Every structure is written in structure tokens, then in C-alpha cells.
From Swiss-Prot:
GO cellular component terms, semicolon-separated: cytoplasm
Gene3D superfamilies per the UniProt record, alphabetical: 3.40.50.20, ATP-grasp fold, A domain (3.30.1490.20), ATP-grasp fold, B domain (3.30.470.20)
Name of the protein in its database record: Probable alpha-L-glutamate ligase
Residues that coordinate or bind Mn(2+) 2: 260, 262
Binding site for Mg(2+) 1: 248, 260
Record-annotated ATP-grasp domain positions: 104-287
Source species taxonomy: Bacteria, Pseudomonadati, Pseudomonadota, Gammaproteobacteria, Vibrionales
Record key words, sorted: ATP-binding, Ligase, Magnesium, Manganese, Metal-binding, Nucleotide-binding, Protein biosynthesis
E.C. number: 6.3.2.-
């Protein structure tokens, strides 16, 4: 098969592993810088051009769209959909998952376990926002943050007020969530491909830190999932419409709760923690499912 990886950096671990794994299975794999693609929108024969030439017809596209380029990246993915190319994650599903509020609203509607969450931009009564999620300790997040950036743990109501006021000064949309203390600074990353959890790791925050992101110095190890945790991860992926994603779960006293669904999960941490060929399993999914015009949305919106 001829497959393209949409990635701005061919030297990232995930991009290199996907190229290596695909070529090892006999596929022709190109890495294409998403931002350097340009499109012929009005033509009856939709095209994508790159470095002065029309891109060939690919059998499948693996989008690795960074959060900072979601708007243009999903436009490129949508153009591939209009051309009838199979995409591992469709543009509408990527957009859905990148909007943290929209994600939580959709998950909530389907009865997926979530931490108690509030959303605000410029509330008239900050104390009521805090009371509404059960009071401190609580976690306050900037809606646009990634890799644990823009996430603050407020241990008292007064501290929470101060943080919310500071974020309001930035004219930012903020999310206020109950702090799942019983998780003890750990979460579970479930790697879902094709409605199956193919790998899972437990990430533990470093001493004195509550964010378990590996980018923030957390550690990771193999974990055995309960049936409920596995079902939660699979259902969350289905709600988002993602064929490939990382579902981050906390173990609360009320059962597993979903913190985030990541449409472009990194491969390095999960492969090292589990010793599994995650990249190879992504290609197994592509080989079984990549057919022309088989996307559910077909680029319609």
C-alpha cells in the first residue's frame, strides 16, 4: 500500500516509528508536512499539492496533527476525505476531540464516567463556580492547554478564586474540575485502535506533582485493565468517532473517569512501558480497513 503520514516533524519518535513499521511490512510510506500542503478547493476533481507537485493517490493517511495546527491540519485531512482516501482518524473526529468542552459534553451525554466539571469564561460569581463542583481541592484548566500546560491544582477555595481571577484576566475559557485525590497522582493511558485497547500504561506523577504527563517528568509502567476501565476507554473512543486515540482515565472511588481523549497519542511512552509494537498494530488496522471511499463522513463536513 502507499501510505502518507501527516506530520510536521519527520524526526519525532512517533513519526519515525510509523514510517519504519510501515516499510517493514512492505508499504511505501511518505512523511508529508501538513502545513506545506495546499489545496485546490473549487475543482470538481479535488487535489492536494505539495512542493510544486500534485500528491499521488494514497491508500491511507495517518494524521499526526498537533494541537497548534488543528484548523489547517483538519482542512488537509478533509481534503483527503473528499478525494476518497481512507484516513485513520477523520477530520470531524479530530476537531471534536480537540475541543475539550465539546468532548466532555458528548461523553456526558453517552453516560461515560467523568469528574464533576464546570466551564466558565467570565463568571459573575466565582464562589458559586467553585461550590458547583464541590469546592477545593480542585483542578483549574485553560481549555487550550496540552501536555499539562495551563493546569493548576488549587488546594483551597481562596487559591481557586485567585487562579480563576488570573485566568479571567487572560480572557480565557476555563474548566474547573473536582480533584480526584484517590488517584494519587496517577492516571491510565489506554491506547485504542479500531475499538480495541491494544496497550495500556499507568503514568505516575513525579514527587510533589499532580500532573502525570510524561512530558512533565512522570514515569510509566505496564498496567492490567479492569473490564470497566477497558469498556470505558473503548466507549469514549466510539463517542469521539476516533479509530486511533489515547484515552486518559483516572481511578476514582466511583469507578473510572475519563480526563481526555487524545486523537494524536505519542508512541514512545506506550511502546517503552508495554514493550508492544504499537506502530505495527496500527498498520494491521489499516491493512484490514483501508478501502477507497470508506470514510464515514466522506469529507462532507
Amino acid at each position: 500500500m502507499r501510505i502518507a503520514i501527516l506530520s510536521r516533524n519527520e524526526n519525532l519518535y512517533s513519526t519515525m516509528r510509523l514510517k519504519q513499521a510501515g516499510e517493514a511490512r512492505g508499504h511505501e510510506v511518505d512523511v508529508i508536512d501538513t502545513l506545506h500542503c495546499y489545496m485546490d478547493i473549487t475543482s470538481n476533481n479535488p487535489k492536494i499539492r505539495y512542493k510544486g507537485e500534485e500528491l499521488p493517490q494514497y491508500d491511507a493517511i495517518i494524521p499526526r496533527i498537533g494541537a497548534s495546527v488543528t484548523f489547517y491540519g483538519t482542512a488537509v485531512v478533509r481534503q483527503f476525505e473528499m478525494m476518497g482516501t481512507f484516513v485513520v482518524n477523520e477530520s470531524v473526529a479530530i476537531s471534536r476531540s480537540r475541543d475539550k468542552l465539546r468532548s466532555l459534553q458528548l461523553l456526558s451525554r453517552k453516560g461515560i464516567g467523568l469528574p464533576r466539571t464546570g466551564f466558565a469564561h467570565h463568571p459573575d460569581n466565582i464562589q458559586d463556580v467553585i461550590r458547583n463542583v464541590g469546592g477545593a481541592p480542585l483542578v483549574i484548566k485553560l481549555l487550550e492547554g496540552t501536555q499539562g500546560i495551563g493546569v493548576v491544582l488549587a488546594e483551597t477555595n481562596k487559591a481557586a478564586e485567585s487562579v480563576i481571577e488570573a485566568f479571567m484576566g487572560l480572557k480565557a475559557n476555563i474548566m474547573v474540575q473536582e480533584f480526584i485525590e484517590e488517584a494519587k497522582g496517577a492516571d491510565i493511558r489506554c491506547f485504542v485502535v479500531g475499538n480495541k485497547v491494544i496497550a495500556a500504561m499507568k503514568r505516575q506523577a513525579k514527587e510533589g506533582e499532580f500532573r502525570s504527563n510524561l512530558h512533565r517528568g512522570g514515569s510509566a509502567q505496564l498496567v492490567r485493565l479492569s473490564k470497566e476501565e477497558r469498556a470505558t476507554a473503548i466507549n469514549a473512543a466510539k463517542v469521539m468517532g476516533l479509530n486511533l486515540c489515547g484515552v486518559d482515565i483516572l481511578q476514582s472511588k466511583n469507578g473510572p473517569v475519563v480526563m481526555e481523549v487524545n486523537s494524536s497519542p505519542g508512541l514512545e511512552g506506550i511502546e517503552q512501558a508495554t514493550n508492544k509494537d504499537v506502530a505495527g498494530m496500527i498498520y494491521e488496522f489499516i491493512e484490514k480497513n483501508a478501502k477507497p471511499n470508506s470514510n464515514r463522513t466522506k469529507g462532507r463536513g
